[in-house]
């Protein structure tokens, strides 16, 4: 189905939630794409209002991936907390809850599904299903 600023998408009226960092170029690009399609949006600046550990675990389920697949390993907090590829899922969830900068962004959620906007164009998948 073709969609766009004048096109229709199946979830046109369903509000999408974006976990957004305004200092991140990819997050800003993803947000701009969604706004261009005029979809209802709930914007969560997750560094100002961090998700709880339970919310992060729920994001894992919605993304269909483990936290190891979307934790930001290049952040200083990752090394400071002694995390590595051998860290358990529980350790990673705890770290992401304590240091939300470790959460890869942007994440767009629609109902029981979510997508990581890497590259930013991936967020448009939420409009096509």
Language-model segments: what does each one mean?
Residues 46-129:
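Thiol/selenol-based redox catalytic cores and closely related redox-interacting motifs
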Residues 2-5:
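Extreme N-terminal basic, low-complexity initiation segments
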Residues 14-32, 41-46:
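Local sequence-structure signature of Cys/Sec-based thiol-disulfide redox active-site neighborhoods
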Residues 8-9:
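Short, positively charged and aromatic/hydrophobic N-terminal segments
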Residues 12-13, 106:
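Positively charged, low-complexity intrinsically disordered regions
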Residues 28-31, 35, 79, 124:
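Class I S-adenosyl-L-methionine
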């Amino acid at each position: 189905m073709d969609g766009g600023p004048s096109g229709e998408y199946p979830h046109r009226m369903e509000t999408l939630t974006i976990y957004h960092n305004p200092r991140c170029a990819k997050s800003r690009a993803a947000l701009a794409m969604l706004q261009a399609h005029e979809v209802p949006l709930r914007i969560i600046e997750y560094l100002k209002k961090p998700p709880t550990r339970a919310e992060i675990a729920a994001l894992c389920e919605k993304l269909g991936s483990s936290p190891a697949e979307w934790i930001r390993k290049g952040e200083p907090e990752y090394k400071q907390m002694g995390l590595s590829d051998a860290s358990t899922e529980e350790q990673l969830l705890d770290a992401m809850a304590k240091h939300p900068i470790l959460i890869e962004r942007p994440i767009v959620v629609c109902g029981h599904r979510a997508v990581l906007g890497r590259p930013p164009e991936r967020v448009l998948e939420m409009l096509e299903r």
